[in-house]
Amino acid sequence: GGETGNDAKAMWFGPRL
């Protein structure tokens, strides 16, 4: 998930990153 489409980062930083 996330606007970047990067689930690896979304799980840490949230949907904003």
UniProtKB/Swiss-Prot annotation:
Keywords recorded for this protein, A-Z: Amidation, Neuropeptide, Secreted
PROSITE patterns reported for this sequence: PYROKININ (PS00539)
GO molecular function annotations of the record: neuropeptide hormone activity
Major location (coarse): secreted
Residues recorded with modification Leucine amide: L17
Subcellular location: Secreted
A biological process from GO: neuropeptide signaling pathway
Cellular component annotations (GO), alphabetically ordered: extracellular region
Function: Myoactive.
Protein name: Pyrokinin-5
Organism, as annotated: Panchlora sp. (strain SR-2005)
Biological classification of the source: Eukaryota, Metazoa, Ecdysozoa, Arthropoda, Hexapoda
